[in-house]
Design a protein with these regions (language model features):
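Residues that form generic nucleotide/phosphate-binding pockets
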Residues: 2, 15-19, 75, 79
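Short, small-residue-biased leader/transition segments that mark boundaries at the very start
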Residues: 3-8
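Alpha-helix initiation and N-capping motif
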Residues: 9-10, 69
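Active-site flanking loop/helix segments enriched in acidic
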Residues: 10-24, 39-43
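Surface-exposed loop/turn and secondary-structure junction residues enriched for glycine/proline
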Residues: 15, 19-20, 27, 51, ...
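An amphipathic alpha-helical micro-motif enriched in hydrophobic residues
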Residues: 28-36, 44-65
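C-terminal end-helix/capping segment
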Residues: 67-81
Length: 81
């Protein structure tokens, strides 16, 4: 998969893949909590920063779990059809 090959060049991303789905999922949870905290506090810039981390880690999790953006698009289309 091209996306994973590109990501593996990044040492941090490579380490995440090495640690597996459970560790990546934990990281997604942490980033989600941090995003929510900043949103509730009204810290727009900090929320954007944390949301960026959340999206990044979610994309890594999807890849590690064998899912793709196309899978998400298909699910959303199914729900709204």
């Amino acid at each position: 998969r091209r996306q994973r090959q590109m990501c593996i060049r990044d040492r941090y991303t490579s380490r995440l893949f090495d640690r597996g789905v459970n560790k990546i999922a934990q990281k997604v949870g942490e980033e989600a909590v941090e995003t929510v905290i900043e949103a509730v506090a009204g810290n727009r810039e900090a929320m954007i920063y944390e949301a960026s981390d959340l999206v990044y880690h979610l994309l890594v999790l999807l890849e590690a779990a064998g899912c793709s953006i196309a899978d998400l698009e298909a699910e959303l289309a199914r729900r709204h059809s």
